[in-house]
């Protein structure tokens, strides 16, 4: 149970989701763990609208989640034909594809298209390695999320969860070690060096590390980059709040959640909650009411004030 709890907490603090939207029927089936049925639903939509790149992308993801690599690559290449973003390179749904030689072609193609549109990335090889770290940081989340849903419905941990949880922790240890090596070689990543998406890699790994001593060690540089607009203030807020919550102190940005007595998510207690939006605004975050409704469907009703 201890292992499940650790991964369970990890899922609460991990807020990245890179899957794109598609048909409600297919998405519902996917969320329920019915991947083969989801594939059929995505393909049905594909035959009706073959140029719908979002649906085609999700079809590729569903194939990847079921380790059907050839089909996954077929639809992924189609979906990304006119796509100039880097999101596919960090989508954990595609993790199963990354040990295939074809993945390098996907990486190169997306990085080329992205730079043609947005300008050259100063350290593109560093960016590529950081993007891979982000993808691995989220690896297996779909399957572990299925275990979480099972636990919430049935009240006990499914036996198939434990090897996944153990492997997830192993990936986390390897990712942190690789991150340290990259920082020693290239320096701390900033937006100007590797782009906004890649620069978030160390923050995600640090936030998901089991040790608060690691988070505390890196917090000053994470905070400074936030204020210098060279790093994510969202991830800084998550890390700062996680340190406080783990020390049984009040969080200050409202980024950490817990399950209450009726197994519904709510934010951990917040210091001076009537001023939380003012603190969030100072680092460019949306009002807490909007954030909580969007992330956990929680109604935040504390009336906000401003200190002069």
Ranges and model annotations:
Residues 45, 78-79:
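Canonical positions in the second alpha-helix
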């Amino acid at each position: 149970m201890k292992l499940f709890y650790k991964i369970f907490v990890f899922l609460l603090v991990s807020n990245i989701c890179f899957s794109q939207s598609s048909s409600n029927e297919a998405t519902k089936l996917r969320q329920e763990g019915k991947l083969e049925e989801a594939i059929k639903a995505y393909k049905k939509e594909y035959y009706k609208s073959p140029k719908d790149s979002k649906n085609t992308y999700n079809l590729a993801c569903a194939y990847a989640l079921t380790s059907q690599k050839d089909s996954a690559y077929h639809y992924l290449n189609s979906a990304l034909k006119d796509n100039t973003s880097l999101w596919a390179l960090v989508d954990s749904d595609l993790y199963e594809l990354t040990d295939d030689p074809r993945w390098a072609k996907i990486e190169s193609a997306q990085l080329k298209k992205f730079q043609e549109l947005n300008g050259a990335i100063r350290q593109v090889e560093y960016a590529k390695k950081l993007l891979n770290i982000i993808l691995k940081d989220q690896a297996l989340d779909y399957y572990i999320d299925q275990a979480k849903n099972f636990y919430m419905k049935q009240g006990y941990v499914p036996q198939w969860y434990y090897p996944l949880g153990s492997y997830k922790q192993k990936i986390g240890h390897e990712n942190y070690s690789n991150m340290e090596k990259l920082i020693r070689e290239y320096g701390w990543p900033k937006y100007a060096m590797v782009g906004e998406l890649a620069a978030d890699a160390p923050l995600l790994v640090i936030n998901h590390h089991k040790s608060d001593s690691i988070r505390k060690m890196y917090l000053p540089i994470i905070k400074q980059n936030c204020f210098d607009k060279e790093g994510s203030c969202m991830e800084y807020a998550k890390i700062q709040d996680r340190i406080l919550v783990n020390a049984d102190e009040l969080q200050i940005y409202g980024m950490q959640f817990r399950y209450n007595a009726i197994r519904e998510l709510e934010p951990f207690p917040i210091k001076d909650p009537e001023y939380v939006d003012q603190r969030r605004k100072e680092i460019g975050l949306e009002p807490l009411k909007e954030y909580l409704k969007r992330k956990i469907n929680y109604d935040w009703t504390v009336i906000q004030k401003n200190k002069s």
